[in-house]
């Protein structure tokens, strides 16, 4: 009986953590990087936002066998003057979350959040980072993900659009199906 109470408490705590609201990633809590590349062979680019290394994690061989979950570092670059909200959708949110990106510390699922709103520094603010001489705002962060790999549907809302652009990424899951309607 005691084991059931402990397991129930852990589930409630994780469920509470997964539903937690998150602080936005803003100019005030950005990181700084030297000259960067926005679009590489491993970049996921949606409008003014780039995850410049996320596609490198697609092969199942990207797993490093840590359990019960692992941390996949993938920063974000956002062109000046833009806002993009990214949401992990569907069942993937139970096993995957955003960590870092100007929020609280930690790299576990319990530390993660399911939605991040990225607001770049304004066109006349110094972000300290650039791509091709053009200002971008940079945030360090990534994903907490299960050790078995997962296909993660992401909805991108660019510049306060109410219409999502859905992309499915592979975090060590190999090839993922094409996204359904967003």
Would you name each region that the model predicts?
Residues 1-19:
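Secretory targeting and sorting signals
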Residues 15-182:
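Non-catalytic macromolecular-recognition regions in eukaryotic signaling proteins
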């Amino acid at each position: 009986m005691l084991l059931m109470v402990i397991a129930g408490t852990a589930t409630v705590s994780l469920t509470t953590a997964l539903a937690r609201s998150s602080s936005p990633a803003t100019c005030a809590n950005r990181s700084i990087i030297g000259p960067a590349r926005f679009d590489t062979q491993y970049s996921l680019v949606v409008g003014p936002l780039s995850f410049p290394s996320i596609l490198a994690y697609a092969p199942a061989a990207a797993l490093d066998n840590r359990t019960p979950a692992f941390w996949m570092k993938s920063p974000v670059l956002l062109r000046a003057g833009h806002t993009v909200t990214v949401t992990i959708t569907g069942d993937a949110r139970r096993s995957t979350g955003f960590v870092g990106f100007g929020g609280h510390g930690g790299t576990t699922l319990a530390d993660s959040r399911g939605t991040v709103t990225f607001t770049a520094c304004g066109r006349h603010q110094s972000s300290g980072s650039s791509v091709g001489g053009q200002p971008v705002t940079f945030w360090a962060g990534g994903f907490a993900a299960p050790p078995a790999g997962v296909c993660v549907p992401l909805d991108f809302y660019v510049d306060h659009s109410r219409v999502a652009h859905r992309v499915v990424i592979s975090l060590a899951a190999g090839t993922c199906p094409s996204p359904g309607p967003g």
